[in-house]
């Protein structure tokens, strides 16, 4: 199995997915903590929850994109 | 790309996980021109047909007690209408048809892509970038038409201290122009990553020792993908609503 520096870079870019996982977990965990304190207000905030998750996740997807570019375009 | 696609023996996989995203002509081989019917064309057409069938046939009977297809049609209509009204307010409701179209196309294309051996048009950046750029230009033009130069107040955060405002304006400007990029890449990236992961596990199924684990993993990932398909369509739609709200009410 041969490989070059681009493959190492793609592997390093995969660390970004883990960072995005921390971010998404933070958003969802804090939402749950708040929702358990005030369950009546939770239902109205699910849209905000998904927007927050989407923003956190987008940066992980950017890392995935960098990995893809290194694998197939470089 | 070609060398990776044939590299079955070096990676240990029977097929390459990214092969499923290759666009092929439907009839014969040859080059792909803009008018060539490809598998992407086929599955986009199928998803539009499915949306039309669901909404037109579902609402054609107008039963007092709705049947299954009528329930789904009414539920999706009510779901999107409530989302638009909650985020954009009453005056955003007239842009509801566009947002409903976006949502139905994305969610049905995502679900159809989960059929084995099918093709996922939303996993291509070309498809999602067109949708995101359409939203971006529509929202920007709408903002200037509705508010005139007051739309630029979106970048001038009047609640911040005066010294900070130019710096914030630059940041807001950058984040405004990155919107179509992140908007399109989020959808395509999620769908592409999910399908690639399923294919990677499917490749492991050829190895006898790993095959029970990989079949279980495919089932689990498939369940997750059903969820992701819906959530990403929802997120795309809700972000469109948020951008539309910014255009209609640009004050911070």
From Swiss-Prot, chain A:
Major localisation: membrane
Q: Where is this site: Reversibly protonated during proton transport?
A: 57
**Highest taxon above the source species:** Bacteria
One term of GO molecular function: proton-transporting ATP synthase activity, rotational mechanism
Q: Name one GO cellular component term.
A: plasma membrane
Q: Where are the transmembrane segments?
A: 5-25, 49-69
Q: How does it sit in the membrane?
A: Multi-pass membrane protein
Record text on subunit structure and interactions: F-type ATPases have 2 components, F(1) - the catalytic core - and F(0) - the membrane proton channel. F(1) has five subunits: alpha(3), beta(3), gamma(1), delta(1), epsilon(1). F(0) has three main subunits: a(1), b(2) and c(10-14). The alpha and beta chains form an alternating ring which encloses part of the gamma chain. F(1) is attached to F(0) by a central stalk formed by the gamma and epsilon chains, while a peripheral stalk is formed by the delta and b chains.
Which family, according to UniProt? Belongs to the ATPase C chain family.
The name of this protein is: ATP synthase subunit c
Q: Which organism is it from?
A: Ruegeria pomeroyi (strain ATCC 700808 / DSM 15171 / DSS-3)
| Taxonomic lineage of the native organism | Bacteria, Pseudomonadati, Pseudomonadota, Alphaproteobacteria, Rhodobacterales
């Amino acid at each position: 199995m041969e490989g070059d520096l681009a493959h190492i870079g793609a592997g390093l870019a995969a660390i970004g997915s883990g960072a995005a996982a921390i971010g998404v977990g933070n958003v969802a965990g804090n939402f749950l903590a708040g929702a358990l304190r005030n369950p009546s207000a939770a239902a109205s905030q699910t849209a905000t929850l998904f927007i927050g998750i989407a923003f956190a996740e987008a940066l992980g997807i950017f890392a995935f994109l960098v990995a893809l570019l290194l694998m197939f375009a470089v | 790309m070609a060398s990776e696609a044939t590299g079955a023996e070096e990676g240990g996989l029977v097929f390459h996980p990214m092969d499923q995203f290759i666009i092929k002509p439907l009839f014969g081989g040859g080059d792909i021109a803009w008018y060539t019917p490809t598998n992407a064309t086929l599955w986009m057409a199928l998803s539009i047909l499915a949306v039309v069938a669901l909404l037109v046939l579902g609402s054609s009977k107008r039963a007092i007690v709705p049947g299954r297809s009528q329930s789904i049609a009414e539920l999706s209509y009510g779901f999107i209408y409530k989302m638009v009204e909650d985020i954009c307010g009453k005056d955003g409701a007239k842009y509801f048809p566009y947002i409903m179209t976006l949502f139905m196309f994305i969610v049905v294309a995502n679900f159809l892509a989960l059929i084995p051996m099918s093709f996922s048009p939303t996993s291509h950046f070309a498809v999602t970038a067109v949708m995101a750029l359409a939203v971006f230009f529509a929202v920007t033009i709408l903002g200037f038409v509705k508010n005139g130069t007051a739309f630029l107040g979106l970048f001038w955060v009047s609640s911040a201290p005066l010294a900070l405002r130019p710096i914030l304006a630059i940041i807001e400007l950058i984040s405004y122009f990155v919107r179509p990029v992140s908007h399109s890449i989020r959808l395509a990236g999620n769908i592409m990553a999910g399908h690639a992961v399923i294919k990677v596990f499917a490749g492991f199924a050829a190895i006898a020792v790993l095959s029970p684990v990989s079949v279980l993993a495919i089932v689990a990932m498939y369940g997750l993908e059903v969820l992701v398909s819906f959530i990403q369509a929802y997120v795309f739609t809700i972000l469109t609503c948020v951008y539309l709200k910014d255009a209609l009410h640009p004050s911070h």
